[in-house]
Design a protein with these regions (language model features):
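Positively charged, low-complexity terminal tracts
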Residues: 1-134
Length: 134
């Protein structure tokens, strides 16, 4: 089976990377915020990012063609993805990042299966987010 990869800026993602990110996204919703308004904004950004990734994954899987397929991510999408990856790695490593994540065993198992992808993506998204304007 041919591996499909897509380039996001200077980050190339395969299907397993997209699946890992999608698996981690729900954790970003549990990160505390300073205000209810900020929490609402974060939830909206998370929902938009999740929809983009799921739509992209669905269209890529169904097409199975070599034709170029583009996903357009905004700076907010990159931030959401990086937060989700960071949260997932913290959960898997037991690292305290100031948030008591509520996660069931099934979700933890799914994250564990994707640990390698998440760990590999983390430095790339960190560097990308560090370059984004405030």
């Amino acid at each position: 089976m041919k591996k499909h990869k897509r380039n996001l800026g200077n980050i190339t993602l395969g299907f397993s990377d997209l699946e890992a990110i999608i698996c981690a996204l729900p954790l970003a919703q549990q990160i505390p915020t300073d205000s209810p308004d900020q929490h609402l904004q974060n939830d909206l950004a998370l929902q938009i990012t999740a929809e983009k990734l799921l739509d992209f994954l669905d269209s890529s899987v169904s097409s199975r063609k070599n034709s170029p397929c583009q996903i357009r991510l905004t700076p907010n999408d990159h931030r959401v993805i990086y937060c989700a990856i960071t949260a997932a790695l913290a959960v898997l490593s037991g690292k305290d990042i100031g948030c008591d994540f509520q996660i069931d065993n099934e979700h933890r198992t799914e994250l564990s299966k994707r640990y390698f992808s998440l760990n590999r993506l983390s430095p790339s998204f960190e560097a990308l987010v560090d370059q984004l304007p405030e």
